[in-house]
């Protein structure tokens, strides 16, 4: 055993550590205020959450890989964060209040009904850290979210302040139920109300069933995290079927579901100048780790088929685009027809209604017959692309009008 250097108190058997290691120093509020800590290795952080830089929580390590948090996980691994065992004896109470959430009832009861739960809880931080909770509400409302939906938020999780949550054992059933649910792959999302004057807008709660601890993560990039978590919640609601029963998480070829809805278009018919309306349930996927804000997207997208040869002038704008993958389901005959048309030199132009409040105004849909996939291109320069595609459509309409006039003239001459 290494002998401690200049211990201020003798660490005998009756010491705070039972005769092993350096004893705990008695804490006073004055000492905590005057203590000077080195700068955080994470770099300067916004002062709205933490008044000064402080070292990361002891026993917390940041890894590069993402991993699930299951009942057998050795620590908290979401977002590459592994949290070791912590004791409350050397932590400062930062907040006290009530945490409320809704828990699904047992399978033998009504599946659509949820049971409201509430527990008194406290949030603790390390000595020397400052978490401004003066403006926090006395009741926090938590929403339970499957952890596998949060894999795209790894970078935002890594840049977070940690706080340990402790629940008072007044309601053992509620606490056991929360541990059971969160130990089986769920995380807690606490969205602070807009009427609250505090700077924190969202806080995530994770549970380690092995360490028996609850850890709160307060992202420094609150705005980015709020937008990302809203997209996750919206996607989750879209995946919930009738009766509130949620299906498995939609992941195709390591891509994450970003939007679900209906795609509608008009398809040329054999009769001259005749078209038939077609539609298909469609889904948009992005790479894991990417975020596509679709909460303001309409539920139905309207597509116009355009000959690809008319789009050659827009190639520079195509290069500066974001790629997403489209997936269509259900009507196999309609899907085959769409593949045949797009494989014969057509592209799809999806116009967003001006009533929609989203930033995207147009996206292009292309089909690869070799890979059997539909690729969507969302130009970053939306304004110039909209103007360019309008010119293309106007030129196409002029060409069609001239062709129609020529056909009529030929028929008249032949008669």
UniProtKB/Swiss-Prot annotation:
Protein name: Prostate tumor-overexpressed gene 1 protein homolog
Keyword Cell division assigned: no
Subunit architecture: May interact with CREBBP. Interacts with FLOT1.
Region (Disordered): 1-54
Membrane-spanning ranges: none
A Pfam family reported for this protein in Swiss-Prot or TrEMBL: Med25
Keywords attached to this entry: Activator, Cell membrane, Cytoplasm, Membrane, Nucleus, Phosphoprotein, Transcription, Transcription regulation, Ubl conjugation
Low complexity compositional bias, start-end: 24-40
Gene Ontology cellular component terms for the protein in this record: nucleus; perinuclear region of cytoplasm; plasma membrane; transcription regulator complex
Compositional bias segments (type: Gly residues): 12-21
Family: Belongs to the Mediator complex subunit 25 family. PTOV1 subfamily.
InterPro entries reported for this sequence: Med25_PTOV (IPR021394), Med25_PTOV_sf (IPR038196)
Protein origin, superkingdom: Eukaryota
GO BP of this protein: positive regulation of transcription by RNA polymerase II
Location of this chain's protein in the cell: Cytoplasm; Nucleus; Cell membrane; Cytoplasm, Perinuclear region
Post-translational modification: Ubiquitinated by the CRL2(KLHDC2) complex, which recognizes the diglycine (Gly-Gly) at the C-terminus, leading to its degradation. Ubiquitinated by the CRL2(APPBP2) complex, which recognizes the Arg-Xaa-Xaa-Gly sequence at the C-terminus, leading to its degradation.
């Amino acid at each position: 055993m290494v002998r401690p250097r200049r211990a201020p108190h003798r660490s005998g058997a009756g010491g705070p550590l039972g005769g092993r290691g350096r004893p705990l120093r008695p804490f006073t509020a004055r000492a905590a205020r005057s203590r000077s800590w080195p700068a955080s290795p994470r770099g300067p952080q916004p002062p709205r959450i933490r008044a000064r830089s402080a070292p990361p929580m002891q026993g917390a390590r940041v890894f590069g890989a993402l991993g699930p948090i299951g009942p057998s996980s050795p620590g908290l691994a979401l977002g590459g964060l592994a949290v070791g065992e912590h004791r409350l004896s050397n932590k400062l109470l930062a907040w006290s209040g009530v945490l409320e959430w809704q828990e699904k009832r047992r399978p033998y009861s009504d599946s659509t009904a949820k049971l409201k739960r509430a527990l008194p809880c406290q949030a603790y931080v390390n000595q020397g850290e400052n978490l401004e909770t003066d403006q926090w509400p006395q009741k926090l409302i938590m929403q339970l979210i499957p952890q596998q939906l949060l894999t795209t938020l790894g970078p935002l999780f890594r840049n977070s302040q940690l706080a340990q949550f402790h629940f008072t054992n007044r309601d053992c059933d509620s606490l056991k139920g929360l541990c059971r649910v969160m130990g089986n792959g769920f995380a807690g999302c606490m969205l602070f109300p807009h009427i609250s004057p505090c700077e924190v807008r969202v806080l995530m709660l994770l549970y380690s069933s092995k360490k028996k601890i609850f850890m709160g993560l307060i992202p420094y990039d609150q705005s980015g995290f709020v937008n990302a978590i809203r997209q996750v919640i919206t996607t989750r609601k879209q995946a919930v079927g009738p009766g509130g029963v949620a299906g498995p998480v939609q992941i195709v070829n390591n891509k994450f579901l970003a939007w679900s809805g209906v795609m509608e278009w008009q398809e040329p018919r054999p009769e001259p100048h005749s078209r038939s309306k077609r539609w298909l349930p469609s889904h948009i996927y992005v790479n894991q780790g990417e975020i596509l804000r679709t909460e303001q997207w309409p539920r139905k997208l309207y597509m116009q088929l355009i000959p690809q040869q008319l789009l050659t002038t827009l190639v520079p704008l195509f290069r500066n685009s974001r790629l997403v993958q489209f997936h269509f389901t259900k009507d196999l005959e309609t899907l085959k027809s769409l593949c045949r048309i797009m494989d014969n030199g057509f592209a799809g132009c999806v116009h967003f209604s001006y009533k929609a409040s989203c930033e995207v105004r147009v996206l292009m849909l292309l089909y690869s017959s070799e890979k059997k996939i539909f690729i969507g291109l969302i130009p970053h320069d939306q304004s110039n692309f909209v103007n360019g595609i309008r010119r293309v459509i106007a030129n196409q309409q002029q060409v069609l009008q001239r062709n129609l006039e020529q056909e009529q003239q030929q028929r008249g001459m032949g008669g």
